[in-house]
């Protein structure tokens, strides 16, 4: 099989970064955790723990583009985060348009009956899973 088999996905944010794990063979991803961030900078030791634990072949970072497809300030920060991931871990890091994944994740939580806001159960990791599945869907499994 060519290409990555196991991937970590990141929904980048300045206060929280959602993390998901996905498999190319199934095209599915699942939520892992939400990392706290200070002005977009995560606890890199926690990211390193995840990389060591899951041993991904590659990583995917969501790009929060504007609705017209143009880059935003946040997408530029997400690209910088992607470059830092690559620099720290030496793995391929891909970016993927994540427009509306957080909106979709909130809708999913509402459909599950979550009505008490998103502090107790944030949507960031679910958004990471959705963007990772989107990236996987655009690539052949083998």
Swiss-Prot record:
GO biological process: rRNA 5'-end processing
Enzyme Commission number(s): 3.1.-.-
Entry's Gene Ontology molecular function annotations: nuclease activity
Superkingdom per UniProt: Bacteria
Disulfide bonds: none
Location(s) in or outside the cell: Cytoplasm
Main localization category: cytoplasm
Broadest EC class assigned to this enzyme: hydrolase
InterPro entries found in the cross-reference section: RNaseH-like_sf, YqgF, YqgF/RNaseH-like_dom, YqgF/RNaseH-like_dom_sf
Pfam families: RuvX
Any single Gene Ontology cellular-component annotation: cytosol
UniProtKB keywords: Cytoplasm, Hydrolase, Nuclease, Ribosome biogenesis
Annotated HAMAP family: Nuclease_YqgF
Family: Belongs to the YqgF nuclease family.
Purpose of the protein: Could be a nuclease involved in processing of the 5'-end of pre-16S rRNA.
Name assigned to this protein: Putative pre-16S rRNA nuclease
UniProt source species: Azotobacter vinelandii (strain DJ / ATCC BAA-1303)
């Amino acid at each position: 099989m060519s290409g990555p088999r196991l991937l970590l996905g990141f929904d980048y944010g300045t206060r929280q970064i959602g993390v998901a794990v996905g498999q190319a063979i199934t095209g599915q991803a699942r939520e892992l955790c939400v990392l706290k961030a200070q002005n977009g900078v995560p606890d890199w030791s926690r990211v390193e723990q995840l990389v060591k634990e899951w041993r991904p072949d590659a990583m995917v970072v969501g790009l929060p583009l504007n609705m017209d497809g143009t880059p935003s300030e946040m997408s530029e920060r997400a690209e910088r985060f992607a470059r830092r991931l690559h620099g720290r871990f030496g793995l391929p890091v891909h970016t993927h348009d994540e427009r509306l994944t957080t909106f979709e994740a909130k809708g999913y939580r509402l459909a599950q009956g979550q009505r008490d806001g998103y502090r107790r159960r944030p949507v960031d990791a679910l958004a990471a899973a959705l963007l990772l599945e989107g990236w996987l869907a655009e690539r052949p499994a083998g």
